[in-house]
Amino acid sequence: MKRRVLCMLLVLAMAVTCLAGCNRKKSVRVVIGSSSTSGDSYLIADTVTRYLAEEMGWDAKVDPVGAAEMFEIIRNDKGKGDTIAIFHDMMYLGVVFGTYGEEYALENITVGPRVAQNPGCCFAAKADAPYNTLVEAAEYLKANPDAEIRVACENGSVSTLCYLAYYNWVLDSYGQEVADQLRVIAAGVTSEKRQMLWDGNVDIIFDDYYGIQQYVGVDDKQLAMKCVGLLDEIEGAVDAPTYAEQGITFNGEPFALSKDFLVYYPQNIDADFAKAVDAAAAKVCENESFKSDMAKLNYRGAYLDSSAAKDFIYNKRTEMTQLIE
């Protein structure tokens, strides 16, 4: 009798253990190429991950490891679906600018779906600057040949691309002499660029449109700022024209740039896993709660399946490479 009871208890324990194992969520590590938890890289990846985990039944967490480690992790992962990356244009720009080797090129990883965009890139100046737009800044330089405008950008980044587009347009539209009156100043993170502006060490900075709103219209002349050019259309932004609206072009076409956030996998990712993420990402981007959460952060969902996303990001890389060269 005791033996029978013991056997029954053993069978029950094994069943419970099996059930618990069957119901255990898959652990997924989402790495990003930033070490910050306050910027768009983390905020977008975290929001996408929460909703994607719900659709996929994951236990997932964003790990802000920084660009160098992110590349290594994705490159060396076994492709079983327990590690993915979500990151913006620096995924290819790091290689284009020569910061990282060709072994980290898009051809050596797998492009997943596009899941989000940040359209908020802009250039800002102090409120009392003698120009209100980037075109007016070029006109100011033309009228004042001894003047210069110092523009703070981060080396090898989206800000560098946006500056190059403006510089090349000034060169084509106003000539070498006016273009030479523009000086790019290497700067670090956003807070550093703002301090450089307030200290009078630069005249224009690359920033985030929503980030500078706290300084627009303030009484403190030392801190007061204004937007002089948006890189893309932003709903409700009426205080500054976009590059396109100002007539700033590249290769004869209006220039616009948003940060595009895509999912990336190791090269040997399981095909069924990638297909499932595509389907889940499509549902996430249609989810009204997700749209609302993204809007609160001033970002937006922007779904493309893996195939379309690959074509999109490869074409964008080609265009940005032409701009750099």
Task: State each model region's role.
Residues 73-74, 152-240:
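Ligand-binding pocket segment of bilobal, Venus flytrap-like solute-binding proteins
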Residues 1-30, 325:
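Short, low-complexity disordered leader/linker segments with a strong preference
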Residues 212-285:
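C-terminal lobe and pocket-closing loops
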Residues 272-325:
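An extracytoplasmic/periplasmic, membrane-proximal ligand-sensing/linker region
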Residues 37-38, 89-93, 119, 129-130, ...:
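Solvent-exposed loop/turn segments at secondary-structure junctions
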Residues 44, 48, 64-71, 81-95, ...:
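Ligand-binding clamshell of periplasmic/extracellular solute-binding protein-like
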Residues 56-58, 76-90, 147-149, 197-207, ...:
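Alpha-to-beta junction loops
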Residues 27-30, 50-59, 77-81, 96-192, ...:
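Hinge/capping helix and adjacent helix->loop/strand transition within the periplasmic-binding protein
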